[in-house]
Each structure stands twice: as C-alpha cells, then as structure tokens.
Swiss-Prot record:
Coiled coil: none annotated. Gene3D superfamilies: Ribosomal protein L17 (3.90.1030.10). This is Large ribosomal subunit protein bL17. SUPFAM superfamilies: Prokaryotic ribosomal protein L17. It comes from Leuconostoc citreum (strain KM20). Keywords: Ribonucleoprotein, Ribosomal protein. One of its GO terms (cellular component) is cytosolic large ribosomal subunit. Pfam families: Ribosomal_L17. Belongs to the bacterial ribosomal protein bL17 family. It comes from the Bacteria.
C-alpha cells in the first residue's frame, strides 16, 4: 500500500499522524499542508470506523493509536467531568456518522504558506 514519507523517519511520521488525527477528532478541523492532510484523512477514517464498531477490540485498537489527551472539561456545579479524545471518538464523533459509509472528512484548499509556498488546506469532519 503506497504512502507518503513526509520527509520523516517512520517513528516521527507515525507520531505526527497520531497527533494530527487526535487533534482533528478533538477540534473537528485542523490546518495543515495538503500532503499531510491526505495521510491524516486515511487514519481518521479508520479511527471513526473503529468508533462505529464500538466493541472492546475496536476500543483497544483505537486506544493504541489515539493520544491520551483531554478533549472536553464539563463543569456541573461541584462535579467536573473530563472527556478524553478516545471517549469523544466513541461517544460524540462516531454516532454522528452512523449512517455514512466512509468519507468522513473534507479537504478545503486555502492560501500557500509564505515561507516555502506549500499548499495549506483545512481538513475538517463532514457535518
């Protein structure tokens, strides 16, 4: 299966894809280069598909890839509930796409970066 090396070693590339995928799941949209966005789209689609499956094995596979970051902090009086990126994937993001089979993300081209003229894009989850 072909993939982009993105000018990095395999461990650096995997870490970058994990970070960008987690950020996309938490925030719903990220700004990055076109090549990175096309690779992150693949990993994000796989994570959302795991979220739709929802069984224990899918949770473990997603937990092995998605970073353990805080997605939301919900304060209700004295109670404080912290939602991780993995919980947000399974509780909020995956149910939004229950009726959709793939194609969970959209790439919108924006301006070129000033320093090196790299094409910047906005990668966002489809509504």
């Amino acid at each position: 299966m072909p993939y982009r090396k993105l000018g990095r070693t395999s461990s650096q590339r995997k870490a970058m894809l994990r970070d960008l995928t987690t950020d996309l799941l938490i925030n719903g949209r990220i700004t990055t280069t076109e090549a990175r966005a096309k690779e992150v789209r693949k990993t994000t689609d796989k994570m959302i598909t795991l979220g739709k499956r929802g069984d224990l094995a899918a949770r473990r596979q997603a937990a092995a890839f998605v970073r353990n970051e805080v997605a939301d902090v919900i304060e209700d009086g004295d109670n404080v509930k912290v939602q991780s990126a993995l919980q947000k994937l399974f509780d909020d993001v995956a149910p939004r796409f229950a009726e959709r089979n793939g194609g969970y993300t959209r790439i919108l081209k924006t301006v070129q970066r000033r320093g090196d003229a790299a094409q910047l894009v906005i990668l966002e989850l489809v509504d």
